[in-house]
Structures are given as structure tokens and as C-alpha cells.
Regions:
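Phosphate-handling DNA/RNA-contact segment within nucleic-acid enzymes
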Residues: 1-96
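TOPRIM fold recognition
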Residues: 55-163
Length: 163
């Protein structure tokens, strides 16, 4: 039985529609296992970014976990590190996987994603090796990059077929 569900609308009339299904438990967010044993866990803001990054890397060599969203203060607000709260999904996963040695942080490359990445790194750096792996383009996430790669490949195929 499903323990966690996230809703997202595609036709939003200019406003994003995102919500969790009532009764969802964030300890059980979207998780992709590796094909072989792995000591690395990659964490993402959402399931779509988890799948997009897997598509871009073309390898299932590590655990991949969606955090079910992140918290970050609004840009420009003064914040204290104490406002950071560990992700229930990440805490639940790590408590059941003592073999994990590395956390690869793959949040979005926007203010919220960078803020979350910095605070996740600080929170876990004493227990795990931390790898920051944000998308190289400012303002992007891995779904944006996967879409861009797909569109480039489709354009090349159309060009090749029109010759």
C-alpha cells in the first residue's frame, strides 16, 4: 500500500499546483535502489528530478531518494541555521541503512535548493561524506536539463531526417 503521495497539476493557469495527499507520511518518499550494492545516497527535491538525473547519468549505481520537497526561507529573509529541520525521508532512510557513507546532494540550483543543500551538508557532514552535485545552470533542476537534452536530440534527428 502507498504510504506517501504527492499531487502536482500540469495545467495551472500561471500558478503551480502542488499538494500532498492527506495522510501521507514523508518518511516513505520516492526511492530508487541501485542495481548493485552502494554506499552512496543521492537526494533530490522531488521524484521527477530523481528520475531525470537517473536518465542523464544513465546508471543506477547509487540509491536515489526524493525528499518530498524542501523547506527554505524566502530569499532575503534573515534566517538562523536552527530553522533547518532534517528531512523525515532522509532520516528514515539513513536510520535503516547503516552502510551508507556518502550523501550526494542534488537539489535545484536556485535559492531554495542552494539553501537546503548548504544546510543538509552542515547537518550531516560529521557523519557522512558530502558531495554537492547541483545542476550546473543557475535556476535549473535536473528535469530542466533532461528536457533540454531531449529537445537537442530531437532537433538533431529532425535535421538528419530532412536531408
Amino acid at each position: 500500500a502507498a504510504r506517501y503521495a504527492f499531487l502536482r497539476g500540469t495545467y495551472t493557469r500561471g500558478k503551480p499546483f502542488k499538494a500532498e495527499v492527506s495522510g501521507s507520511d514523508k518518511r516513505f518518499c520516492f526511492l530508487l535502489p541501485p542495481k548493485k550494492e552502494s554506499k552512496r545516497l543521492a537526494v533530490y527535491e522531488a521524484a521527477i528530478e530523481t528520475l531525470a538525473h537517473l536518465t542523464l547519468e544513465e546508471t543506477a549505481d547509487k540509491w536515489r531518494l526524493s525528499l518530498g520537497g524542501i523547506y527554505a526561507p524566502k530569499e532575503g529573509e534573515s534566517t538562523r541555521s536552527s530553522s533547518f529541520k532534517a528531512s523525515p525521508a532522509l532520516e528514515a532512510f539513513l536510520s535503516g541503512r547503516p552502510e551508507i557513507e556518502e550523501i550526494e546532494i542534488c537539489t535545484n540550483n536556485d535559492y531554495a535548493g542552494r539553501w537546503a543543500a548548504e544546510h543538509i551538508a552542515k547537518f550531516y557532514q560529521s557523519r557522512y561524506q558530502i558531495i554537492l552535485n547541483l545542476p550546473e545552470k543557475e535556476g535549473c533542476d535536473y528535469a530542466d536539463l533532461a528536457k533540454e537534452k531531449y529537445e537537442e536530440r530531437a532537433a538533431r534527428q529532425r535535421e538528419a531526417c530532412s536531408r
